[in-house]
Amino acid sequence: MRSVTNAFGNSGELNDQVDETGYRKFDIHEGILFCIELSETMFKESSDLEYKSPLLEILESLDELMSQLVITRPGTAIGCYFYYCNREDAKEGIYELFPLRDINATFMKKLNDLLEDLSSGRISLYDYFMFQQTGSEKQVRLSVLFTFMLDTFLEEIPGQKQLSNKRVFLFTDIDKPQEAQDIDERARLRRLTIDLFDNKVNFATFFIGYADKPFDNEFYSDILQLGSHTNENTGLDSEFDGPSTKPIDAKYIKSRILRKKEVKRIMFQCPLILDEKTNFIVGVKGYTMYTHEKAGVRYKLVYEHEDIRQEAYSKRKFLNPITGEDVTGKTVKVYPYGDLDINLSDSQDQIVMEAYTQKDAFLKIIGFRSSSKSIHYFNNIDKSSFIVPDEAKYEGSIRTLASLLKILRKKDKIAILWGKLKSNSHPSLYTLSPSSVKDYNEGFYLYRVPFLDEIRKFPSLLSYDDGSEHKLDYDNMKKVTQSIMGYFNLRDGYNPSDFKNPLLQKHYKVLHDYLLQIETTFDENETPNTKKDRMMREDDSLRKLYYIRNKILESEKSEDPIIQRLNKYVKIWNMFYKKFNDDNISIKEEKKPFDKKPKFNI
């Protein structure tokens, strides 16, 4: 049966809208609403935050989030609101730092100026928000806040696309608001929660707890997890379980904000045909695993018209090469066949295409094979996709693909697929490989298999060292490398997003400083140590390498024999490397030139 989803689950699902005839494509336009409840403890310095207040940590995290989104997703809308605020420009106790609009330089500058004023001591958070601890009669009721959230998301903004993914980042450290003991008010909040759910608004909660004051999430779990229920027809749990109302420590505020910003971008949706004869079909959708942002590729062409900047658009024309006449409306598509040109109508062209493939995107299983015989490094010619079930059109897809995942894992096999991911592309071969048991992601990886003409042969070498002469040395080098790696552990695994692209960061820092009017000074007489510190601040990869280098150098001076081994292992590794490198050079020097045939002058 069709799975019941709710708006408090995975944010990527909000874009999976499907009509009755087929899959529909949507451009993701995400809106993030920061809602922060002010309290006495929000202004107090915390040792977990290097003696910063949680409120300042939230503001700095918001500034960093906007700096990242303007690079990766500049079309994202962000709004920031504080409730329980006594400022004169606050409406019903809700103060708007900036409204829910697409990221722009004006809002970024306003936030940046506020942070500069706070760091220089020109103003304090207490003074800026005019916060005064008063009784509950001044506190903003959650029903007013929830209604305000809904109205904000439903507001139509001229010149701004409709939001397809709506999220609320809710920050509070008050676990017992005034509504907690009011049964009628709780019921009203549940009804408002249903309204938010119906309008596809989901929550990312940041319930902040402290060592001396842990956060009790009973109240918020009661009102926010209302959308989680069981599918009565199948007895299966809902695909999503509502928002996480688990409290967090103050020190995790920034990392969680930057992690929660991620949205799952659907790359494609299509049916997966398991058996064409019996019409056994399930729905799947694919996500992009990684994207690589590049500097200087995002720009627009504009022109000035009556002192107003307008965006310029390109248009293609077809011209007669002799007369220069515009023949765009007279062109037709023909297929050359010998000395004839065959002109087919759209319907006839469709019939020809359907003779060898389907019109819409599809994937069809044509067989199974051992993983060891199918997954090869030289077949890696395209980006892989992560495949998960899609219950939107084909009910029972989750249960079916879960069984397929278990069987493929048990038999150590992969599925061979034939199909295409876009309606206007040509069919290709694919391998559908299950994720490993240790893998954090549970699903399938889809790899395109190249055709023969897409595989390039390795060049023939005049001299090639197969390593047989150094087999023992290679084995020893591997053991030494394993010992060295034992001293350096990635606690949370390798996450590419944790290592920023220095070229990309430099490009956008120049734009950022220019728009926000931030003065930058460059000392021509910069000392080597100062230059090194500056480079490590700008490049976190260099900073990590510098840390590893220092750890190796410090191990040589250590009195602990176990720590001293690290430096000894590195010296042995360098010895092997130098030996292999010298042998390779000697092989090249011994290479004899070809014997040239004598030339005869006639």
UniProtKB/Swiss-Prot annotation:
EC number(s) given by UniProt:
3.6.4.12
Query: Do the record's keywords include Signal?
Result: no
One of the entry's Gene Ontology molecular-function terms is: ATP binding
User: Which intervals hold domain Ku?
Assistant: 268-483
Please give the catalytic activity noted in the UniProt record: ATP + H2O = ADP + phosphate + H(+)
Q: Domain of life here?
A: Eukaryota
InterPro entries found in the cross-reference section: Ku70, Ku70/Ku80_beta-barrel_dom, KU70_core_dom, Ku_C, Ku_N, SPOC-like_C_dom_sf, vWFA_dom_sf
**Sorted alphabetically, which keywords does the UniProt record give?**
ATP-binding, Chromosome, DNA damage, DNA recombination, DNA repair, DNA-binding, Helicase, Hydrolase, Nucleotide-binding, Nucleus, Phosphoprotein, Telomere, Ubl conjugation
- One GO BP: double-strand break repair via nonhomologous end joining
Q: How is it modified after translation?
A: Sumoylated by MMS21.
* Top class in the EC scheme: hydrolase
Please name the SMART domains in this protein's record: Ku78
Locations listed in the record = Nucleus; Chromosome, Telomere
> Which effect does the record note for changing residue 562 to T?
In strain: ABYS 60, DBVPG6044, SK1 and YPS128
- GO CC, any one term: Ku70:Ku80 complex
What Pfam families would the database entry show?
Answer: Ku, Ku_C, Ku_N
Q: To which protein family does this belong?
A: Belongs to the ku70 family.
What do we know about how this protein assembles, alone or with others? Heterodimer of YKU70/HDF1 and YKU80/HDF2.
Could you share any additional remarks the record makes about this protein? Answer: Present with 892 molecules/cell in log phase SD medium.
Name assigned to this protein: ATP-dependent DNA helicase II subunit 1
Source organism (scientific name): Saccharomyces cerevisiae (strain ATCC 204508 / S288c)
